[in-house]
Design a protein with these regions (language model features):
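Extended, structured, electrostatic nucleic-acid-contact surfaces
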Residues: 17-21, 225-248, 258-261
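Glycine-rich, often acidic, oxyanion-interacting loops/wings at catalytic, nucleic-acid
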Residues: 150-241
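Gly/Thr-rich phosphate-binding beta-strand-loop-beta motif of the actin/hexokinase/Hsp70
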Residues: 20-41, 120, 152
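Low-complexity, acidic/Ser/Thr- and charged residue-rich accessory regions of DNA metabolism proteins
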Residues: 289, 330-380
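Short, basic/hydrophobic alpha-helical segments
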Residues: 55-72
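Intrinsically disordered, low-complexity and often Lys/Arg-enriched segments
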Residues: 1-24, 49-51, 56, 372-380
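Short alpha-helix plus adjacent loop in nuclease-associated cores
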Residues: 96-132, 137-140, 144, 182, ...
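Phosphate-backbone recognition surface of nucleic-acid-processing proteins
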Residues: 243-246, 252-337, 341
């Protein structure tokens, strides 16, 4: 089958005509770094056009389209989709970001740019495909900052582990229960002092390595502290973060992560959808009218899932410290020996996700009268 001579079915042509009747011409674009593959249906010549444009010429194509109507530009979710969506919207057109898995249903040939663009084009005028909201520039940079913080934290752990391995090779076994980098540096200093007393020839090389370790750790810790200070200041000045921090168990950094990963709250139809996006929806299977609710699924946004789990653990710790009379719903669940503790934590995390969506959607702080599971114990 030749992509250049591709013919659309009558049903596909009807869907395109419906879009055009609404004042939008569907255009499918396969995004890339330097060249974009553009595909659309020419209503005058009755043919599918599928051609390649450079980055500059693509945006010229958006500014001066070959038809009078505005365009509905569809493309797959990728690294460039948010920027392109903002540019398309600024030029007066509409965009449609689609999940990559949804486009696979329209790909019937080998993998080429033209075939991908054709599949994206067909997905653009198909109304049943779910769309993804584009993130604004502030949200993107905030997510990038959180990614840098996580990367620096991993580097700090990696630096400590490398030094532990070096100490082990020199006969120093570190305590497994002491995981901080400061402990590793202290153990290295003790080894250095021992080598100095023994007049060991290895003293100079260990000294240089220890100084490099100290410098690297100080540098990483300073960068992490700088980023966290910015995030704390951001949380204090952002209304959504303030409302999120009013939820028991959610701190400033967790609120910023929730706010950043959530993005546009209107892209989730309900709080249940946001909880499922976070990965705290139970697996459901059913047949013949019998439905079984299983364990928590392993899908979902891993960053959001980790933060909500830690917030749920924090809320559980709050309950142990504050609820001396066992008056809260969490205390009732903990009192049931048949309920596993992690199951309680997952249920709290699920409720945290749903309440977080609600407070951001309604732009109001947490009201513990409306949620018994997360409410703090009252003073008697």
């Amino acid at each position: 089958m030749n992509v250049a001579k591709c013919r659309l079915s009558e049903g596909e042509l009807n869907l395109i005509n419906m879009q055009v009747a609404q004042g939008l011409v569907p255009v499918g674009v396969d995004l890339a770094a330097r060249v974009f593959q553009v595909c659309y249906y020419d209503l005058d010549k009755k043919v599918v056009k599928n051609f390649q444009l450079t980055r500059e010429k693509f945006f010229d194509f958006l500014r001066n389209p070959p038809f009078e109507q505005k365009m509905l530009v569809g493309f797959e979710a990728c690294g460039a989709c948010n920027y392109c969506a903002r540019e398309i919207k600024a030029l007066g057109h509409r965009y449609k970001i689609m999940p990559t898995k949804a486009i696979k249903a329209f790909l019937q040939l080998a993998k080429t740019d033209k075939i991908d663009a054709l599949g994206i084009f067909k997905g653009t005028f198909t109304p049943s495909i779910n769309t993804i909201s584009a993130r604004d520039e502030q949200n993107q940079t905030l997510l990038n900052l959180l990614g840098i913080r996580e990367q620096l934290s991993k580097q700090l752990v990696q630096t400590g582990n490398n030094q532990r391995a070096m100490l082990y090779e020199l006969g120093v076994v570190c305590n497994e229960k002491k995981t901080g980098v400061d402990y590793v540096i202290k153990a290295s200093e003790e080894l250095l002092e021992k080598l100095k007393q023994e007049n060991s020839p290895a003293y100079s090389s260990v000294e240089v390595g220890l100084e490099a370790l100290r410098s690297n750790v100080r540098n990483i810790e300073a960068q992490i502290k700088n980023i966290e200070q910015y995030l704390l200041d951001y949380a204090k000045n952002n209304e959504d973060c303030k409302n999120l921090m009013s939820i028991p168990g959610i701190g400033a950094l967790s609120a910023v992560i929730l706010h950043a990963v959530m993005g546009d709250v209107n892209s989730y139809p309900s709080s249940r959808h946001f909880a499922a996006f976070a990965g705290f929806a139970p697996r459901v299977s059913g047949s013949g009218g019998k439905v079984t609710v299983g364990e928590i699924v392993k899908t979902g946004n891993r960053h959001l899932k980790k933060v909500l789990y830690m917030c749920a653990v924090a809320r559980l710790s709050q309950n142990k410290k504050l609820d001396h009379n066992s008056s809260t719903r969490i205390s009732e669940l903990l009192g049931d020996e048949t309920t596993p503790k992690k199951k309680i934590i997952c249920s709290i995390a699920n409720r945290l996700a749903r309440v977080a969506w609600t407070v951001v959607k309604n732009k109001e702080p947490f009201n513990q009268d409306k949620c018994r599971l997360l409410s703090l114990p009252t003073d008697n």
